[in-house]
Curated annotation (Swiss-Prot):
This is Arginine decarboxylase proenzyme. PANTHER family: S-ADENOSYLMETHIONINE DECARBOXYLASE PROENZYME (PTHR33866:SF2). The lineage of its organism: Archaea, Thermoproteota, Thermoprotei, Desulfurococcales, Desulfurococcaceae. Keywords: Autocatalytic cleavage, Decarboxylase, Lyase, Polyamine biosynthesis, Pyruvate, Schiff base, Zymogen. InterPro entries: AdoMetDC_fam_prok, ArgDC, S-AdoMet_deCO2ase_core, S-AdoMet_deCOase_pro-enz. Disulfide bonds: none annotated. The modification Pyruvic acid (Ser) is found at S80. Binds 1 pyruvoyl group covalently per subunit. Pathway: Amine and polyamine biosynthesis; agmatine biosynthesis; agmatine from L-arginine: step 1/1. Belongs to the prokaryotic AdoMetDC family. Type 1 subfamily. One of its GO terms (cellular component) is cytosol. Heterooctamer of four alpha and four beta chains arranged as a tetramer of alpha/beta heterodimers. The record marks E79, S80 as: Cleavage (non-hydrolytic).
């Protein structure tokens, strides 16, 4: 634990580590019209950020036309990001929700996206990306 000073001048004890939660998955059998709908996907990541208690900074998108084209949407949130990448020709999308902090809920954001895109099937993964206390010395995880 360490003590930090807040912007209002008060002090608070906090755990000295970063909390990182990463929910990501693949969606199969999604209606291609939904996967081509750039504006709809942008609105979806906005809503996902809201229900997950994330503070939205900006939403950007890119549409790639032609065979194997698709849409990529990225929401930059104060806590990290939400992305959706689509391949309408394959009725396929990937979804990535990563948050730093304990107040936001990446699961809720992921679930909303799945509910709205209505895939025939999906696979979801979770990774705890929180930082442990930093080890002293040693070379574990370092490239020499």
């Amino acid at each position: 634990m360490k003590t930090v000073e807040l912007t209002n001048g008060s002090k608070k004890k906090v755990e000295d580590r970063i909390v990182g939660r990463h929910v990501y998955g693949n969606l199969y059998g999604v209606d291609p019209a939904k996967l081509w709908d750039e504006e709809g996907l942008k609105e979806l990541v906005r809503e996902a950020a809201e229900v997950a208690n994330m503070k939205l900074v900006e939403v950007r998108s890119w549409k790639f036309t032609g065979y194997h084209g698709g849409v990529s949407v990225m929401a930059l949130v104060l806590e990290s990001h939400i992305t959706i990448h689509t391949w309408p020709d394959y009725e396929y999308a990937t979804v990535d929700v990563y948050t730093c902090g304990e107040r936001s809920d990446p699961w809720r954001a992921f679930e909303l996206i799945v509910e709205r895109l209505e895939p025939e099937d999906y696979v979801v993964h979770y990774s705890d990306r929180s930082s442990p206390k930093r080890p002293l010395g040693g070379t574990a995880g370092r490239i020499q």
